[in-house]
Design a protein with these regions (language model features):
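Metal-dependent polysaccharide deacetylase catalytic core of the NodB/CE4 family, i.e.
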Residues: 2-94, 146-152
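Active-site glycine- and acidic-residue-rich loops that bind
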Residues: 14-17, 124-128, 153-162
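Short amphipathic alpha-helices and their capping/turn segments at secondary-structure boundaries
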Residues: 18-32, 131-137, 168-172
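C-terminal domain-boundary segment and adjacent tail
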Residues: 4, 8, 105-111, 148-187
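Charged, low-complexity C-terminal accessory regions
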Residues: 121-151
Length: 187
């Protein structure tokens, strides 16, 4: 069956700290087909002009270290140390990347939005939404991505996107030798 890497903000919009939902994290970890990875702390910005690209506005060493500490502290409170990272909103400031890279074993990033930045960890490229029909291989891998909910993204889990992903997976399984894995299992 399929496996999933769930990129989870550690305190989404400053309303849902992981430490208040340890039972959910424990349940996800118990399943065996989820990898839990980091996806920012707040997944929101102080600026109004860059969407939710939280780590794009983190432009100093002090800001980067402080936000990373807040994020990893929440993860520690649920007894989990994520080894993977994805930028909220795909973008990150070079100063943030400098401090994120050594914390994680890998970063799952968008090739174009990364702007050729060097990471101090392994990088995996992939950005195909569950709703898309033009699927891309990156270094022999396919990485579907989605959002659980929200009306600002096309790649949310609704019936139409679920049906499209089923069609895409059926085609890929028929056409290629596919092995489902989490990103951590690719290391």
């Amino acid at each position: 069956g399929a496996k999933f890497t769930l990129f989870i903000p550690s305190n989404y919009h400053n309303k849902f700290p992981l430490s208040d939902h340890k039972d959910w994290i424990d349940w996800l970890k118990s399943k065996g087909y989820f990898e839990l990875a980091a996806h920012g702390h707040y997944h929101m910005c102080e600026r109004n002009d860059i969407g939710e690209c939280e780590f794009f506005e983190i432009d100093t060493e002090d800001k980067a270290k402080s936000r990373i500490w807040q994020m990893m502290d929440e993860w520690s409170d649920v007894d989990h140390k994520p080894i993977g990272w994805r930028n909220p909103g795909w973008l990150a400031h070079p100063e943030a990347v400098k401090w994120l890279g050594p914390i994680f074993k890998y970063a799952a990033i968008h090739k174009e939005h990364n702007h050729n930045m060097e990471w101090a960890c392994k990088t995996f490229y992939g950005h195909d939404g569950i709703h898309e029909t033009d699927i891309s291989f990156h270094d022999g891998n396919i990485m579907f991505q989605s959002h659980i909910a929200g009306d600002w993204n096309d790649n949310v889990w609704n019936k139409e996107n679920y049906e499209q992903l089923k069609v895409s997976l059926a085609y890929l399984l028929k056409s290629y030798d596919i092995k489902f894995s989490t990103i951590a299992e690719l290391l």
